[in-house]
């Protein structure tokens, strides 16, 4: 579900940004390879960037300079110390941001829980940051090395996929049922016993999905590591560039879903 949401939303925004550029309008980027993030805070700096920027400007910053936070900082410096003071101020600023994030998607308890889930995750990250920094210093860990980056990315995936489970659920109770069923009904055998074919998808559909994921991941890695040195399609030689254009059009014709019997399905995010 999370990957489908990303493909739809990010792809739609790419179309909008591209159409805007054809008309001479440059729109802000809304996604920046979020699944390469090493923690939840970084993920939300890369995912739905415009919503995050709005919440930061109109919720986080006003709260951070509010009288309540200033009073807390003065009290904390006298009685609590730097660490607890900063953590308390962080909690005061993050809580309304993530409450608004949840309510922005809808006035429902599972959306509120979704926002509070990230509030707890990000606050825990801020609380444990000194521990993380101490571990890195003690063991002389190179944060750019793959042995560190890959586990961090995988850990972030678990956090994000768990959050999106509650986002996808039809209600908070349904979300809890879905979450606990992961542990109660966990079976790796569903990957090869034919269960996956019960979701109205055949082997050809899964092949297309797998190929799309590989292509998306490959392009993401190339852009994340800047392997093209900032060059894009416009920097390619004309024959290669047009061959790629026609190849992309052909891929839509081959893999696209259309024709007799096709029923158009609304984008997931169209509901928001």
Could you say what each language-model-derived stretch is?
Residues 1-271:
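Membrane-embedded transmembrane alpha-helical bundles that form the catalytic cores
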């Amino acid at each position: 579900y999370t990957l489908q949401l990303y493909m739809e939303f990010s792809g739609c925004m790419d179309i909008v940004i591209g159409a805007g550029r054809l008309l001479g309008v440059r729109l802000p980027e809304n996604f920046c390879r979020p699944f390469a993030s090493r923690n939840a805070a970084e993920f939300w700096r890369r995912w739905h960037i415009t919503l995050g920027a709005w919440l930061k400007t109109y919720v986080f910053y006003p709260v951070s300079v509010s009288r309540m936070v200033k009073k807390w900082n003065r009290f904390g410096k006298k009685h609590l110390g730097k660490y607890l003071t900063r953590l308390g101020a962080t909690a005061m600023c993050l809580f309304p941001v993530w409450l608004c994030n949840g309510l922005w998607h809808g006035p429902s308890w599972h959306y509120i829980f979704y926002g509070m889930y990230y509030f707890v995750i990000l606050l825990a990250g801020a609380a444990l940051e000194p521990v993380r920094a101490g571990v890195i210093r003690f063991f002389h860990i190179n944060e750019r090395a793959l042995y560190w980056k890959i586990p961090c990315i995988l850990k972030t995936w678990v956090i994000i996929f768990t959050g999106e489970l509650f986002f996808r659920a039809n209600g908070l109770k349904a979300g809890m049922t879905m979450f606990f069923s992961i542990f109660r009904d966990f079976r790796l055998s569903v990957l090869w016993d034919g269960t996956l074919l019960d979701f109205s998808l055949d082997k050809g559909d899964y092949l297309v999905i797998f190929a799309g994921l590989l292509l998306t991941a490959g392009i993401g890695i190339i852009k994340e590591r800047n392997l093209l040195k900032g060059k894009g399609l416009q920097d390619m030689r004309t024959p290669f560039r047009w061959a790629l254009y026609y190849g992309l059009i052909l891929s839509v014709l081959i893999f696209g879903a259309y024709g007799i019997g096709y029923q158009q399905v609304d984008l997931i995010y169209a509901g928001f």
